């Protein structure tokens, strides 16, 4: 006769609890968290923000059904030298940023840390330019410092 499915009895709670814990490994998010998979593949290495140097300005074509050129920049991260593409939000945002500027990037906020909306392959966005908020520069509240 094969083994019973679950222990039953007055003192079986600990055994039941331990058995349940093993099933967590079949859940995708649990497995990713325990094996630290995000930190291993993520260019930001699990951090919420990262500093980088602008290498070039690029235009990324929007996905169907939209027709636009989304303004982005190629950024080389200071901490590990990896190169990523970051979206530049705001009207005229790309005019403010020039090559060799120091920018701070954050995740763009797509599902499961992926790209957002119609911008293919872009997972990050620019928030600071030379230590000043890009939003403040675009609104005219602050001037971009010259490095």
From Swiss-Prot:
<dbReference type="InterPro" id="IPR022863">
    <property type="entry name" value="Ribosomal_uS12_arc"/>
</dbReference>
<protein>
    <recommendedName>
        <fullName>Small ribosomal subunit protein uS12</fullName>
    </recommendedName>
</protein>
<dbReference type="InterPro" id="IPR006032">
    <property type="entry name" value="Ribosomal_uS12"/>
</dbReference>
<comment type="subunit">
    <text>Part of the 30S ribosomal subunit.</text>
</comment>
<dbReference type="GO" id="GO:0019843">
    <property type="term" value="F:rRNA binding"/>
</dbReference>
<dbReference type="InterPro" id="IPR012340">
    <property type="entry name" value="NA-bd_OB-fold"/>
</dbReference>
<comment type="function">
    <text>With S4 and S5 plays an important role in translational accuracy. Located at the interface of the 30S and 50S subunits.</text>
</comment>
<dbReference type="Pfam" id="PF00164">
    <property type="entry name" value="Ribosom_S12_S23"/>
</dbReference>
<comment type="similarity">
    <text>Belongs to the universal ribosomal protein uS12 family.</text>
</comment>
<dbReference type="InterPro" id="IPR005680">
    <property type="entry name" value="Ribosomal_uS12_euk/arc"/>
</dbReference>
<keyword id="KW-0694">RNA-binding</keyword>
<dbReference type="GO" id="GO:0006412">
    <property type="term" value="P:translation"/>
</dbReference>
<keyword id="KW-0687">Ribonucleoprotein</keyword>
<keyword id="KW-0689">Ribosomal protein</keyword>
<dbReference type="GO" id="GO:0015935">
    <property type="term" value="C:small ribosomal subunit"/>
</dbReference>
<dbReference type="GO" id="GO:0003735">
    <property type="term" value="F:structural constituent of ribosome"/>
</dbReference>
<keyword id="KW-0699">rRNA-binding</keyword>
């Amino acid at each position: 006769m094969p083994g019973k499915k679950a222990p039953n009895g007055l003192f079986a709670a600990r055994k039941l609890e331990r058995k349940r814990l093993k099933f967590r490994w079949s859940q995708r998010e649990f497995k990713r968290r325990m094996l630290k998979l995000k930190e291993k593949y993520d260019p930001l290495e699990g951090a919420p923000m990262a500093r980088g140097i602008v290498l070039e300005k690029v235009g990324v074509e929007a996905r169907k059904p939209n027709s636009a050129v989304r303004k982005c920049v190629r950024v080389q991260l200071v901490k590990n030298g990896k190169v990523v593409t970051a979206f530049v939000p705001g009207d005229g945002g790309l005019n403010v940023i020039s090559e060799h500027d120091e920018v701070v990037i954050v995740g763009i906020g797509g599902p499961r840390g992926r790209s957002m909306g119609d911008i293919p392959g872009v997972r990050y966005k620019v928030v600071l330019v030379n230590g000043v908020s890009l939003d403040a520069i675009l609104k005219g509240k602050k001037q971009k410092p010259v490095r």
